[in-house]
Amino acid sequence: DAMFLVGETRETPMHVGGINLYTLPDDVDEAEWLNEQLALLRQPQGIRRPFSEVLKLTPLGQYGPIRLEPDRDIDMHYHVRAAALPKPGRYREMFELASRLHSGLLDRTRPLWEITLISGLPNRQIATYTKIHHALMDGAATIHFTNSMLSPDPAERRA
């Protein structure tokens, strides 16, 4: 995992990103739903590792061993964001936004992830763009984690 930190540059970021699309039921108010989801996702209690942990380096910096330690002051408003697409809110604008969000490096003084809820899409759709550093979780683990969060079985869901 340390190699992903050593090899990272502005030109070669070492994070993975993904977009998920969700269609809201007709009887759900989009603005109300978004506000509820933001409030829910921004609650720091119950957030599990590695999302609650911050990178700690030894005196050798990124070339030495790395470890993750609990971030006791995690700023969930920093990690969980909202963005509204300009009208008419096409998928092209969503992908342009995701590209801009993906282009910046993650702040190594904070837990190495961000999620953005994206509104303004057609057909009552909402998107999430998630960015996670590869040192924290690889692509396969990210897919497994996302699938477990979205499971219809509450016993399998975790956040």
Functional labels for PLM-detected ranges:
Residues 1-159:
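Non-catalytic N-terminal regions of enzymes
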